[in-house]
């Protein structure tokens, strides 16, 4: 069976009309994927210290030919190109990075930056990114993000230390109270001891006075003068140191002997023990009628 030319022409037209939509879609997506795109987030910020090196990246996506990309710094409404700065490319699998180098960062680098790409006579600009440069002198005054993040942990660590002075103060107050209580008890015991000593001294003084009186009475009773009175013949006592001639005749003269007692009686009786006793003196008295 022979195919007619008209049938062949109809088949070709059918395949052409069937493939046109797919070819158009592929072509459209191909154009979209090959457009240059700059991926800088809107209102992005970077905080850096003056004197440190820094790399500002501009993510660029393209197809075959790499576009010409530049950096500029915003000054009011205009953007001044930074052609004298060091730049470089960093290629990765699905995207590339156009890098602006700061070696080192200076205080006047503070501001907003923007990258732009020139592709097929078209200028594509990115969103601006801002650099906040902190001077080294004021860096110690402004805490970093790491320090701000570590502050809660620092507070948790300092909480036990905050209770330590309170504990020390409480212990010191308790110690002072105990010392005062012991001092009061010592004062009370000293006062009671003094009162007891005063009572004992008073009793001792009374006993000393009583013994002194008894000794004086005994000495007075032991000391006497004897004569020839017949009534005194029988008045001699034991331990008497006076000797007389008893029971003499009435008309005869008699001799009486008397002893002189030099004992010391008084509060300083202890001193008398160290004093040597003088020899006893006797006196003879002749009594005549």
Swiss-Prot record:
Residue ranges constituting the Ig-like V-type domain according to the UniProt record: 31-132
GO cellular component: plasma membrane
Transmembrane feature ranges: 158-178
Signal peptide start and end residues: 1-30
An annotated Gene Ontology molecular function: signaling receptor activity
Major location category of this protein: membrane
Glycosites: 75, 94, 110
This protein's UniProt keywords: Adaptive immunity, Cell membrane, Disulfide bond, Glycoprotein, Immunity, Immunoglobulin domain, Membrane, Phosphoprotein, Receptor, Signal, Transmembrane, Transmembrane helix
UniProt keyword Repressor present: no
PTM note: Phosphorylated on Tyr residues by TNFRSF14 and by antigen receptors cross-linking, both inducing association with PTPN6 and PTPN11.
Gene3D superfamilies: Immunoglobulins
Residue intervals annotated with topology Cytoplasmic: 179-289
Outcome of mutating residue 282 to F: No change of phosphorylation implicated in interaction with PTPN6 and PTPN11. Severe reduction of phosphorylation
Topological domain ranges for the Extracellular compartment: 31-157
Alphabetical GO biological process terms: adaptive immune response; immune response-regulating cell surface receptor signaling pathway; negative regulation of T cell proliferation
Tree of life domain: Eukaryota
Xref: InterPro entries: BTLA, Ig-like_dom, Ig-like_dom_sf, Ig-like_fold, Ig_sub
Function: Inhibitory receptor on lymphocytes that negatively regulates antigen receptor signaling via PTPN6/SHP-1 and PTPN11/SHP-2. May interact in cis (on the same cell) or in trans (on other cells) with TNFRSF14. In cis interactions, appears to play an immune regulatory role inhibiting in trans interactions in naive T cells to maintain a resting state. In trans interactions, can predominate during adaptive immune response to provide survival signals to effector T cells.
Assembly behavior: Interacts with tyrosine phosphatases PTPN6/SHP-1 and PTPN11/SHP-2. Interacts with TNFRSF14/HVEM (via cysteine-rich domain 1).
Official protein name in the record: B- and T-lymphocyte attenuator
Species of origin: Homo sapiens (Human)
Gene encoding the protein: BTLA
């Amino acid at each position: 069976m022979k195919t007619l030319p008209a049938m062949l022409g109809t088949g070709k037209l059918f395949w052409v009309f069937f493939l046109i939509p797919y070819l158009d879609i592929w072509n459209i997506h191909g154009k979209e994927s090959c457009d240059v795109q700059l991926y800088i987030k809107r209102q992005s910020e970077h905080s850096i210290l003056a004197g440190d090196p820094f790399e500002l990246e501009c993510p660029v996506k393209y197809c075959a030919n790499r576009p010409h990309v530049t950096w500029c710094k915003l000054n009011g409404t205009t953007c001044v190109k930074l052609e004298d700065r060091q730049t470089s490319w960093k290629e990765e699998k699905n995207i590339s990075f156009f890098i602006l180098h700061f070696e080192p960062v200076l205080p006047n680098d503070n501001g907003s930056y923007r990258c732009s790409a020139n592709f097929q006579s078209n200028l594509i600009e990115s969103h601006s990114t801002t650099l906040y440069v902190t001077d080294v002198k004021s860096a110690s005054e402004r805490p970093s993000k790491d320090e701000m993040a570590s502050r809660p942990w620092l507070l948790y660590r300092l909480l036990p230390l905050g209770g330590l002075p309170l504990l020390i103060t409480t212990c010191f107050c308790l110690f002072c109270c105990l010392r005062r209580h012991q001092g009061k008890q010592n004062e009370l015991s000293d006062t009671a001891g003094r009162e007891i000593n005063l009572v004992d001294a008073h009793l001792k003084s009374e006993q000393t006075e009583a013994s002194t009186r008894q000794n004086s009475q005994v000495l007075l009773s032991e000391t006497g003068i004897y004569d020839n009175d017949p009534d005194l013949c029988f008045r001699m006592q034991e331990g008497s140191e006076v000797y007389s001639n008893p029971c003499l005749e009435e008309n005869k003269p008699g001799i009486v002997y008397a002893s002189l007692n030099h004992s010391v009686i008084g509060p300083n009786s202890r001193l008398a023990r160290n004093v040597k006793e003088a020899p006893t003196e006797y006196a003879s008295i002749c009594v005549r009628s």
